[in-house]
């Protein structure tokens, strides 16, 4: 799954995590100030960033682009020399580019949040008639937002195009790897589906979850300091009362609660998804045989195989029913949680409309980052089922025992109803 595309996968991912951590620490330990020697100084203390699209080519941003390129280039150069790999340009440099695009999308959110405050304060002044506000000022504010949105959409579309090629290259690498070992793999149940379909789904799902995880981490790095700052204004929570860093603790508590709650409710889903793929593969395989052999795909056999499909789907529907009830209830409550937390501050008159929108946006960004597992749980379930299927291939190639769920199927004589 990984060795076909990445050089020495285990060491590669560990080293990339360590290198990324060192790069972040070096940046905050003084790396961001080095740009001053190149004519790209950071913002002076106390000065607010530029509001609008021009922030993306301001001197602090330009220096970060150079810093990231150097860090990524050094990491790639090491791996190109240490463990050359056919797909190294896509797996190493391609991954670095996707991470950079993820960082850029987070900075778009930061830029939009900075735009919220002045614009909504302007609206409040116009509605309350506390200061003269012209239509031109409001139109100008909306044009500022449009500039940010245009850059975000352009970069986002280009990133999606690149990611599509990245995923297909990963699928190609897995396909070539498994086809090269096909004589040993062809006897594994549903081997054709595992090569043709599961490789495609695995690469796209891992990429989606990986980008989501990186985005969550970068969002926390970008927005947690802002949330700490706003916690100075919002230091009282409903029911709990006054506590330091109230907004941060509220976001952590609510996200951890949702993660544990939904993980417990959906614990049975990965195994059921795996079995669903197995019964579908068995039914499809018999139909394919029936296209070329008259003695295959007889009505009785097809009826038995379809009974397995129906039985597993009905079990899946039942378990997804209560999981979706729990998930939807939590997400609906989540829509109100930010406003619920701000009620004491709103009643006390501590917030303007602009600041309230900024706080809600920042709180939502941090909360969603902590809720990575909640928002990704159904995708994680899908990935686990795919991983279990491809893991059987890995086991055959390294002469390891098959995963338990495959052994149960073999021990049951290939009869799905006895393996459940």
Swiss-Prot record:
InterPro entries, per database record: ABC1_TM_sf (IPR036640), ABC_transporter_sub-D (IPR050835), SbmA_BacA (IPR009248)
Coiled-coil regions, chain positions: none
GO terms classed as biological process: peptide transport
Domain of life per record: Bacteria
Keywords: Cell inner membrane, Cell membrane, Membrane, Plasmid, Transmembrane, Transmembrane helix, Transport
Residue stretches spanning the membrane: 11-31, 61-81, 92-112, 143-163, 210-230, 247-267, 336-356
Molecular function in Gene Ontology: ATP binding; peptide transmembrane transporter activity
Membrane-topology annotation of the record: Multi-pass membrane protein
Pfam families registered for this protein in UniProt: SbmA_BacA (PF05992)
Gene Ontology CC annotation, any one: plasma membrane
Locations listed in the record: Cell inner membrane
Purpose of the protein: Functions in the transport of molecules, possibly peptides, across the inner membrane. Is essential for bacteroid development.
Family the UniProt entry places it in: Belongs to the peptide uptake permease (PUP) (TC 9.A.18) family.
Xref: NCBIfam families: PRK11098.1 (NF008306), PRK12369.1 (NF009036)
Descriptive protein name: Bacteroid development protein BacA
Organism field: Rhizobium meliloti (strain 1021) (Ensifer meliloti)
Encoding gene, per UniProt annotation: bacA
